[in-house]
Design a protein with these regions (language model features):
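Non-catalytic, structured segments within soluble enzyme domains
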Residues: 1, 31-34, 261-264
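Conserved, well-ordered alpha-helix/loop/beta-strand core segments that scaffold catalytic motifs
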Residues: 1-30, 38
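Beta-lactam-recognizing serine transpeptidase/beta-lactamase-like catalytic domain environment
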Residues: 5, 38-143, 147-264
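Short, surface-exposed helix-loop/turn micro-motifs enriched in polar/charged residues
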Residues: 24-34, 160-162, 212
Length: 264
């Protein structure tokens, strides 16, 4: 058995991931991967909080167990934590009245329905057993700007001297029947005229929206496919998620916001 994991890198990743989770009050578990950029080999992979495989039924997140054991009404903070860990849709019906009941009920056919406590307990156990790195969909955020930039350069449609103007906001579908939406840069920043390197340095959302407009949906989507974002990674670990939030070329052509959101 040959593993690509480096125990020293793994230990460092787990230490700093735990520190970051505490600093930023992470609700939905943290994940981190370190890869060899030349081969794709995984040097470290961590999902926190962890659990003890010898005692998998115990919920190791003290905050979650405290919420689960409450007999009075849940606070807004409690509900926020549950939704952050399990997803809003997953818990909405269970905690609709704000109280976790330990009583079983029956459906219209007389079948027993597990108590809300038991349902949530099972969901929390399953959540801590999962390897978050591969079983959950991850929204890449601003790191995707590198994909947009690469598509522009490789296609020859743009070069590093390509400039676009950032005035701080861009409103689409204004006054139309379609969904009106205003895009901003982080913290309301206005970056003015920038080339590609400056836009990457500033993580300018509006520059990359205009870059995607220049590329057009068909070319942009071709590169999204070429980078492998429309298919599983093929990692030799079980239960890799097959969900995707990538809009195809037709969807990006039909709805401007689909193209713009994908760009940055």
């Amino acid at each position: 058995l040959n593993l690509t994991l480096d125990e020293n890198v793994q230990a460092i990743v787990e230490e700093y991931l735990a520190e970051a989770m505490e600093t930023f009050s992470v609700h939905g578990r943290g994940s981190a991967i370190v890869m060899n950029v030349k081969t794709g080999a995984i040097l470290a992979m961590a999902s926190l909080e962890q659990f003890d495989p010898n005692d998998p039924m115990t919920i190791y997140d003290d905050k979650m167990q405290t919420i689960l054991d409450k007999t009075d009404a849940l606070t807004a903070d409690d509900i926020d934590w549950l939704e952050g860990r399990l997803g809003e849709k997953n818990v909405a019906g269970i905690i609709a009245d704000g109280v976790i009941s330990q009583e079983t009920t029956e459906d219209e056919n007389g079948n027993t329905i597990s108590s809300e406590y038991t349902q949530l307990q099972g969901m929390l156990r399953e959540a801590q057993w999962k390897n978050k790195n591969i079983t959950e969909l991850y929204m890449p955020g601003s790191v995707f700007k590198l994909i947009t930039a690469s598509a522009g350069l490789d296609s020859g449609i743009m070069n590093m001297n390509q400039t676009f103007y950032c005035n701080g906001e861009l409103t689409v579908n204004q006054g139309s029947e379609l969904w009106e939406h205003t895009y901003h840069c982080a913290n309301g920043e206005v970056h003015n005229l920038q080339n590609m390197a400056q836009a990457l340095d500033n993580s300018c959302n509006l520059w990359f929206i205009q870059a995607a407009q220049t590329l057009q949906p068909t070319v942009f989507y071709d590169y999204i496919q070429a980078f492998g974002f429309t298919q599983p990674t093929g990692v030799d670990l079980p239960s890799e998620t097959r969900w995707t939030s990538v809009y195809n070329a037709e969807q990006m052509a039909e709805v401007d916001t689909n193209l713009y959101t994908a760009a940055f």
